[in-house]
């Protein structure tokens, strides 16, 4: 598709859409317990304030894909039954409806050193018991296809000033979670 405004190019890429899931009380409770035990991680953008939301994303994926815990928490979060090592990236949101296909999924600049096979992206609502599994991308494909932003850069597609150097992809550019092995 031809695009006359180069800033709008990001709207035309990919067909993936986020999958809405209901968040259970059990998932909330497990995530809260784990977050309290974890404390503050080095390089945490929110100084540990979002640990519970991150853990909730992990609990959702654990249940959906029947994953087991990582035996190397510094490199990945969960392992699928087939042995695929997943790093779960969760963003909290005040939205109550599915994120738009052009919304961004991010991996911080220091995370590419992690030894995982794929990144899985979620958005978790702070207002309702819903989450959206935005999709996944193999680490190799993500690092090849994502757009890099340095701290202080402004993303021309949405005017967002980047707070930490990161790699971004739109939800529409990810692979649907049902394609994970």
Where do the protein language model's features map onto the residues?
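Nucleic-acid endonuclease domains
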Residues: 1-84, 89-181
């Amino acid at each position: 598709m031809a695009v006359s405004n180069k800033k709008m190019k990001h709207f035309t890429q990919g067909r993936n859409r986020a999958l809405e899931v209901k968040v259970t009380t059990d998932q909330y409770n497990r995530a809260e317990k784990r977050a309290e035990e974890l404390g503050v991680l080095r390089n945490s953008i929110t100084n540990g304030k979002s640990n519970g939301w991150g853990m909730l994303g992990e609990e959702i994926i654990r249940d959906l894909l029947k994953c087991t815990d990582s035996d190397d928490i510094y490199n990945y979060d969960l392992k699928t039954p087939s042995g695929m090592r997943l790093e779960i990236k969760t963003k909290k949101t005040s939205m109550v409806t599915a994120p738009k296909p052009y919304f961004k999924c991010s991996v911080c600049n220091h995370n590419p050193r992690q030894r995982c096979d794929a990144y899985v992206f979620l958005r978790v609502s702070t207002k309702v018991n819903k989450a959206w599994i935005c999709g996944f991308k193999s680490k190799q494909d993500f690092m090849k296809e994502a757009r890099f932003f340095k701290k202080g850069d402004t993303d021309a597609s949405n005017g967002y000033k980047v707070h930490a150097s990161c790699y971004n992809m739109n939800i529409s550019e990810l692979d649907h979670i049902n394609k994970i092995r």
